[in-house]
């Protein structure tokens, strides 16, 4: 999914995760095909043969994918990071884009100038603009700023298509930046620490999604039952810091997260408190058992909600960092406050700090429509309650507490299909 053509051809005998959406004609074509793909008896990364012929629009021609100069330029970048340079060059050339915005997360900015030079060298007559504002996640895609700067194409790196390309205000290309790792150590570690026959739910960030799917048949041959869960519309196995699938503790023995850091894993732990969670760091090659203080988190959030119920004036913060803020969610909360005769003030912020809000001391409660984890992780540091939209609806009596509706489990579904990060205009009209 997104690999350049030469990689697809080179890996024609290997597996890859199934695409989420397959058209009827493609499905019929596949059904008529007698070609079978055998699992590779290997513990190295398993990338897959394409399950369908790429559309002409997306298929990278050999004059790009096999260009020795382009391949030499790609060698300047880490070999285990797939920046999909040929695909990007092809998209720029075919779209006629002249001014291209490049948006990277902090950890990949060190490659930004190299990628910029490569693209301008092989796409004559174009210029690139590296966007330097902080990018925390897929919700921070900044098509608004890119458009305001006169760009006609935005290339967003290392996050999935949280904001669909038919919604962004300019043409957008998502580059997942698949990271290849040697999985032999991971397999050996799991075999040494987990009993065969156990059921493992594997999750991770989008960079390791292909690896997760490649691991499944290998782990199953080793005697494990492997589940790759999904919370739509995210990809199977993909989790975000605010969005993760809900699993059955009766069916899942372990939750395994592939990736560095805990931020995304904590989302899955909050949503699945009774399932033991483990994290495999592919960089340090360590497997660790992870824990989370659910009692403390629930207490802090309930205290904030209780304090908000007596607040005489509210403040509503709409996050302006990329696409974090949803205006429809804001309008819905405004409507509920108006119904109850509660005065409020609106505030537009790209980043939210305690000192900034403390300056407006007449506001007794804040609800931020930006990142739920800001309230969950750092809400205690703010002088007034800082609620998520979900918590605001509880405080206003619109929704019941998670103890009643989710059997005591705090939901992490902000960007799920019906999550509050995706509020539609119709939801506001029905209030």
Swiss-Prot record:
Quote the cofactor binding remark.
Binds 1 [4Fe-4S] cluster per subunit. The cluster is coordinated with 3 cysteines and an exchangeable S-adenosyl-L-methionine.
Highest taxon listed in the record's lineage: Eukaryota
| GO MF annotation list | 2-(3-amino-3-carboxypropyl)histidine synthase activity; 4 iron, 4 sulfur cluster binding; metal ion binding
- Name the pathway it acts in: Protein modification; peptidyl-diphthamide biosynthesis
User: What does the entry list as the binding residues for [4Fe-4S] cluster?
Assistant: 139, 242, 371
List cofactor names only.
[4Fe-4S] cluster
> Looking at its record, which EC class is this enzyme?
transferase
Please state where this protein is localized. Cytoplasm
Please verify whether the record's keywords include Iron-sulfur.
Answer: yes
Reaction(s) the record says it catalyses: L-histidyl-[translation elongation factor 2] + S-adenosyl-L-methionine = 2-[(3S)-amino-3-carboxypropyl]-L-histidyl-[translation elongation factor 2] + S-methyl-5'-thioadenosine + H(+)
Name the Enzyme Commission number(s) assigned to this protein: 2.5.1.108
Q: Where is the composition biased (Polar residues)?
A: 28-47
GO cellular component: a single term: 2-(3-amino-3-carboxypropyl)histidine synthase complex
**What residue ranges carry the coiled-coil annotation?**
none
* Keyword Transcription appears in the UniProt entry: no
* Renumbered residue ranges of the record's region Disordered: 1-57
Q: What does this protein do?
A: Catalyzes the first step of diphthamide biosynthesis, a post-translational modification of histidine which occurs in elongation factor 2. Dph1 and dph2 transfer a 3-amino-3-carboxypropyl (ACP) group from S-adenosyl-L-methionine (SAM) to a histidine residue, the reaction is assisted by a reduction system comprising dph3 and a NADH-dependent reductase, predominantly cbr1.
Subunit and partners: Component of the 2-(3-amino-3-carboxypropyl)histidine synthase complex composed of dph1, dph2, dph3 and a NADH-dependent reductase, predominantly cbr1.
Q: Which family does it belong to?
A: Belongs to the DPH1/DPH2 family. DPH1 subfamily.
Q: What is this protein's name?
A: 2-(3-amino-3-carboxypropyl)histidine synthase subunit 1
**Biological source species:** Emericella nidulans (strain FGSC A4 / ATCC 38163 / CBS 112.46 / NRRL 194 / M139)
């Amino acid at each position: 999914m997104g690999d350049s053509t030469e990689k697809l051809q080179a890996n024609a005998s290997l597996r890859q995760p199934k695409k989420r959406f397959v058209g009827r004609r493609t499905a019929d074509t596949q059904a008529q095909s007698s070609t079978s793909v055998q699992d590779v008896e290997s513990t190295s990364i398993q990338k897959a043969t394409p399950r369908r012929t790429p559309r002409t629009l997306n298929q990278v021609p050999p004059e790009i994918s096999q260009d020795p100069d382009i391949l030499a330029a790609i060698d300047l970048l880490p070999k285990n990071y797939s920046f999909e340079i040929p695909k990007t060059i092809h998209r720029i050339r075919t779209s006629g884009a002249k001014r291209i915005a490049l948006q990277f997360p902090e950890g990949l900015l060190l490659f930004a100038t190299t990628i910029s030079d490569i693209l301008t060298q092989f796409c004559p007559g174009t210029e690139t603009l590296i966007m330097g504002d902080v990018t925390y996640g897929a919700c921070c895609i900044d098509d608004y700023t890119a458009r305001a700067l006169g760009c006609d194409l935005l290339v967003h790196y290392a996050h999935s298509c949280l904001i669909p390309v038919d919604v962004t205000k300019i043409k957008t290309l998502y580059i997942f930046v698949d990271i290849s790792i040697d999985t032999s150590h991971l397999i050996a570690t799991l075999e040494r620490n987990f009993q065969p026959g156990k059921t493992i739910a594997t999750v991770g960030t989008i960079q390791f999604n292909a690896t997760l799917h490649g691991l499944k048949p290998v782990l199953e041959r080793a005697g494990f039952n492997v589940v790759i869960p999904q919370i739509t519309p995210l990809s199977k196995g993909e989790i975000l810091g605010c969005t993760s699938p809900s699993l059955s503790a009766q069916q899942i023995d372990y939750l395994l997260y592939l990736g560095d850091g805990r931020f995304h894993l904590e989302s899955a732990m909050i949503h699945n408190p009774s399932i033991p969670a483990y994290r495999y760091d592919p960089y340090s090659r360590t497997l660790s058992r992870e824990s989370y203080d659910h009692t403390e988190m629930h207490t802090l959030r309930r205290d904030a909600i209780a304090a908000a119920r007596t607040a005489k004036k509210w403040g509503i913060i709409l996050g302006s960092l990329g696409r974090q803020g949803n205006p429809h969610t804001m309008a819905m909360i405004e409507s509920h406050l108006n119904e109850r005769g509660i005065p409020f003030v609106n505030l537009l912020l790209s980043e939210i700090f305690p000192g900034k809000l403390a300056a407006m001391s007449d506001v007794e409660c804040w609800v931020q429509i930006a990142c739920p984890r800001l309230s969950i992780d750092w809400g205690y540091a703010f002088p007034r309650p800082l609620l998520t939209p979900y918590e605001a609806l509880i405080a206003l009596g619109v929704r019941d507490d998670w103890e009643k509706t989710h059997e005591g489990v705090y939901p992490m579904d902000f960007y799920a299909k019906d999550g509050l990060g995706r509020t539609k205009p119709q939801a506001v009209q029905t209030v």
